[in-house]
Amino acid sequence: VKLGGYGGALVKDVIGVYVEEFYPFREATVELSNGYHAKLWGELSRLNGAELVAEFKTGQAQGSVAIAKRKLGSSTAWYQGTELTDDSQRAFFRGIAADLGINATGLESTEVIKRGPYQIEIDHKANTVKVTKG
C-alpha cells in the first residue's frame, strides 16, 4: 500500500482533492449540499487546491468533498467522489454542459452534437422528437 491518499498525484496534486478513504453507505442515499443525492459509496476526502462544488450533507462522510472542480489553464478538471443517483447524475452533467455552452436539454435518449455552426440531434430510441430551429 502506497501512503499519501487514494488516486495518487493525479487526484491530489492535479485535480486538488486528497482522498483518505472510501466506503459503502449505510443509508440508501445521502444528500449533498447542492441538493444532489448520492448512493452506494462515498469518500472521506478534503480539498487540496480544488474548489468545492458539493459536500456530503448527511451520512458518515458529512462535511467531506463529494464534488470538486479545479481550473487548469483554459480547462477545468472535475472530481466526483461518489456515485450520484440517476437524476442527480443527469443534472450534474447538464450543469457542466451548460457551463460549456452546450445545449443538453433534449430527451434522455437524444444526443445533441454541435460541429461548428451545425447542430446534430440523434434519437437513440423510437421516439418522435420535434426539433426547433435555433
Predicted features and spans:
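A conserved amphipathic helix/loop scaffold
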Residues: 1-134
